[in-house]
Amino acid sequence: MKIIHYIPSIDRTAGGTSTYIQVLGKELGKLAEVHIITHASENPLPIDNCKIHYVSGYNPLKGSFKIEVNKLFDVLKPDLVHVNCCWMPACAFVQQMAQKRNIKVVFTPHGMLEPWIIKRHYWTRKVPALLLYQKSAIKNADCLQATAESEKQNLLKLGYNSNIKIVKLGIDAESIAMKTSWKKSKQMLFLSRVHIKKGINYLIEAADILRDELQGYKIVVAGE
C-alpha cells in the first residue's frame, strides 16, 4: 500500500503535529510505502522509513504548489492521502486534488475543530474559511480521524461528517532513556502548553482539594 501524508510543517518548532508525524512515519513505514509532502523549514525533524517531498508554499496567485503536488500524485499514484491540519487552504486543495483522482482521503484536524478553536476569530477567520473551503473539506473526506473520544463527540456535533474513527497518539518508547536512579521525590510535573484546554485547571483544582495530603510536594508547570 502506498500512502501520502500532507502536513504543512515538520519543523521542530511546529509543535505536536511534527512529533506525531515523526512517530507515525517511522512505524507506518514498516508496513507500507509512506511519502510525506510538506514545506521546507530551518529545522525539520528526521523521519525514518519514509520519503519526504518538499513543495513550494501555497500562494493563490501562483500555480507552483498545485503543479508540484499534482506531479507527485501522478508519479507516486498513492492508494491513500492523509491530510493533517486544517484552517489552511493548502490542506483543502491537497484533498481536492487527491479526490479528483478518486484517491481516498483521511482528514485529521489534530484538535483544530474543537469548539474553543472555532470560536477564536470566528467572524473574521473561521466563517470565511468554512464558507470557502473548510466545511466542504470536512464533509467530503472519506474518513475523519479523532485522537480521543471527546474530540470525536465534538466532530459529530459539527454535523459535517459522521464517519469518524478514533486513533490515539503513540510515543516512541525506544528513544526514551531509562532513569538510572529511582529515588522518590515529592514532585509533580505538568508538561504542556499552559492553557485551560490542556487541563491545567483540573490540576489546580485537585491540588487545592488535596492541599493537606500534598504538604511537602512541589508542583512544576513547564510549558508555553
Task: Cite the ranges covered by each PLM segment.
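A short, basic/aromatic alpha-helical/loop segment that forms part
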Residues: 14, 173-175, 195-200, 213-214
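Acidic anion/phosphate-binding donor-loop and adjacent secondary structure
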Residues: 156, 168-185
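Conserved donor-binding/catalytic core segment of Leloir-type glycosyltransferases
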Residues: 2-4, 145, 180-209, 219-220
